[in-house]
A protein has these predicted regions:
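Short amphipathic alpha-helix adjacent to the substrate-entry channel of hydrolases
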Residues: 77-94
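The feature captures the conserved acid-bearing segment of alpha/beta-hydrolase catalytic domains
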Residues: 158-166, 172-180, 188-228, 232, ...
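Alpha/beta-hydrolase
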Residues: 68, 170, 247-250
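N-terminal cap/lid segment of alpha/beta-hydrolase-fold proteins
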Residues: 26-59
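Alpha/beta-hydrolase active-site loop
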Residues: 102-123, 146
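Primarily recognizes the serine-hydrolase "nucleophile elbow" in alpha/beta-hydrolase
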Residues: 35, 119-183, 194
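Short beta-strand element of the alpha/beta-hydrolase
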Residues: 61-70
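C-terminal catalytic histidine-bearing segment of alpha/beta-hydrolase fold enzymes
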Residues: 228, 235-278
């Protein structure tokens, strides 16, 4: 009798898993490629300022992540991170202008223009403009920080940065970016904090923020320590929902892999009105 009951429970579990997988498989995704988002900003902007939008089809009010690629502000291409796909989330992969053909403030402006595009356009594809998240890795994390912390960038497009539902900078430079310092003739180990540094714009945020870092012994020079100092300053100005994560065993390049899973948990929690447990 006990064996029969166990077999029934296993059968019910298999049926449940089959139904769950079937429901997941029924969600199709569309991708629109190379959408211009910053018209009128010049010839180089016309070349670089395009985005891809990956989103679930037939789903209403889905959340969207605006994703900025890394590359030291001098390279890289837009992408849709595999670790965020197939999760019921829209993902906008953004190209932006690069050093040295553009200066850093033009690049930050591109990031703001892309986020403004998201606020104005996601609803036409079924997305919820109240569930827009901003994220990026390395240089992309730096751009995430700048447009979330320094509100004037989005204000230029008629958007209040405080409408962003959550910010997830992955291993971002918190001081003035090293390639900006290089252009100024300043070495990689000499710190500068000017108005293009996220640390310069520390403020109390209405939305949650994750400060994400690779292993402190495997990261870029001082990168974990920058995250920790930035996190501490954000706590001191009154942020209760800013969380520091260090991914042991992962370097600067590989840390997005575990970070994506954490980010997906927070997106789900924020959308449901309850932050996940650490």
């Amino acid at each position: 009798m006990q064996i029969i009951m166990i077999m029934k429970r296993i059968s019910l579990l298999l049926i449940f898993l089959t139904l769950a997988l079937s429901a997941s498989a029924q969600v199709a995704y569309n991708i629109e490629k190379d959408i211009p988002y910053h018209p009128g900003a010049g010839e180089y902007a016309a070349e670089r300022c395009v985005l891809d939008f990956y989103y679930p089809v037939g789903v209403k009010d889905f959340p969207t992540v605006v994703w900025f690629h890394g590359g030291g502000l001098t390279g890289g291409q837009k992408d849709i991170p595999a670790g965020l796909k197939d999760s019921g989330i829209g993902i906008i992969g953004v190209n932006y202008r690069l050093l040295p053909k553009a200066d850093v403030k033009e690049i930050i402006d591109d990031a703001a223009a892309a986020v403004a595009w998201a606020f104005k356009e996601v609803a036409s594809r079924g997305g919820n403009p109240d569930k827009i998240f901003v994220a990026g890795h390395s240089a992309g994390g730096y751009l995430t920080d700048m447009i979330v912390l320094d509100k004037h960038w989005l204000e230029a497009y008629g958007i209040d940065a405080d409408r962003i539902a959550g910010a997830f900078p992955y291993s971002a430079q918190k001081i003035t970016h090293f390639n900006v310092r290089k252009k100024m003739g300043i070495g990689p180990l000499q710190a500068v904090v000017d108005d293009t540094a996220p640390l310069f714009h520390v403020r109390k945020l209405p939305m949650p923020m994750l400060v994400l870092s690779g292993d402190r012994e495997m990261e870029m020079n001082g990168r974990y320590e920058e995250q920790a100092y930035f996190w501490r300053m954000m706590k001191l100005v009154g942020n209760e929902n800013v969380f520091l994560y260090e991914f042991d065993g992962y370097d600067h390049v590989s840390m997005p892999y575990p970070a994506h899973n954490v980010v997906k948990r927070y997106i789900k929690g924020i959308c449901e009105g309850k932050l996940p447990q650490r």
